[in-house]
Regions:
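Short loop/turn microsegments at loop-to-beta-strand junctions
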Residues: 94-96, 153, 185-187
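Extracytoplasmic/periplasmic ligand-binding sensor regions of membrane-associated signaling proteins
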Residues: 93, 102-179
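Extreme N-terminal signal-anchor transmembrane helix of membrane signaling/transducer proteins, especially
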Residues: 1-22, 26, 30, 277-285
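Extracellular/periplasmic juxtamembrane segments that couple receptor/chemosensory ectodomains to their
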Residues: 162, 193-194, 205-275
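Extracytoplasmic/periplasmic sensor domains and loops in membrane signaling proteins
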Residues: 72-84, 109-142, 173, 203-235
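Solvent-exposed, extracytoplasmic
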Residues: 79-90, 163-207
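Sensory-module boundary signal marking interfaces of small helical input modules
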Residues: 20, 173-176, 265
């Protein structure tokens, strides 16, 4: 009878563990997805600031062209003053604003060789031309002037041959993402629509960025293949930590990824299991 009771309690305990584990992981899936969505919404609201500033510039230039018929020289002075206001709003050095007006580059921070810069062949300029007055965001690329990874936000005037653009260096996204609250030992990754990291806050300290990028590439491939949709799906990070993955795609194609260690998700359950087996072992001794 004693053995039967022991086996009954053991089976009951194992079954309870499985039920609790399933419930915890399912709840974590819902919460993690909601967190990823909220982080995406927060980042979207920050990007709206750049969109609003660009639209302010292009709308005013369109108005000046239609109502007041300003000459190019006067427009150029207005654009330079507008750039100063933009930098005052977002913070000095956070964006590098410039414009192309009738084939001429107007820059808040002029660079050497700007007269020979083939802007018409750049991705940001072609995207702005094709967007018919909508704001565009490029993917991450290496800027030929500064030789640094950058994202360009640009918009073309509707009634005038002017394109305004802001270069945003990736380190300047830290301010926006830095306000996010992350679960214990969680990692956050913001990527462009091609999966290249824009900004990240990770526990993988000491790992080179190239290795982290390769890890994200593999993770996104598994997301695309539907391999991480189950509530108990996980990945192994470069430090061999088992992690749940929560993902959300923003309206502009950027991707938000949140990874949380299983130890964080199931920490309390592990303690329960340890206590249960200690009690069971003690019952065997007595």
């Amino acid at each position: 009878l004693y053995v039967i009771m022991f086996l009954f309690l053991l089976v009951l305990g194992l079954n309870s563990y499985a039920i609790l584990r399933r419930a915890l992981l399912k709840n974590a899936k819902q919460l993690g997805t909601s967190l990823a969505r909220s982080y995406a919404a927060e980042e979207r609201s920050n990007l709206t600031v750049y969109e609003t500033l660009l639209s302010f510039g292009t709308l005013n230039l369109d108005r000046l062209a239609e109502e007041e018929a300003w000459e190019d020289e006067r427009k150029e002075l207005w654009i330079l003053q507008y750039f100063k206001r933009v930098q005052a709003v977002v913070g000095d050095g956070r964006v590098d604003p410039y414009a192309v007006m009738n084939g001429k580059i107007i820059a808040a921070n002029p660079w050497e060789g700007d007269n020979s810069y083939d802007y018409a062949q750049t991705n940001w300029y072609r995207m702005a031309e094709e967007a018919e007055g909508e704001v565009i965001f490029t993917d991450v690329y290496t800027d030929v002037i500064y030789d640094r990874p950058v994202i360009t936000v640009a918009q073309k005037c509707v009634t005038d041959d002017i394109v305004i653009a802001f270069d945003i260096f990736l380190e300047n996204f830290q301010f926006e993402a830095g306000g996010f609250y992350l679960p214990q030992n969680a990692s956050f990754y913001l990527c462009d629509k091609n999966g290249r990291m824009i900004w990240y806050d990770t526990t993988l300290t000491g790992y080179p960025q190239e290795e982290i990028q390769a890890y994200i590439d593999g993770l996104l491939e598994r997301v695309e293949n539907g391999e991480l949709e189950d509530y108990d799906a996980y990945v192994r990070s470069p430090d061999n930590d088992r992690r749940a993955v929560y993902y959300y795609e923003m309206s502009n194609g950027w991707q938000v990824i949140l990874t949380v260690p299983y130890n964080t998700l199931l920490g309390g359950l592990g303690q329960f299991t340890t206590v249960f087996f200690i009690v069971m072992m003690l019952s065997l001794i007595h």
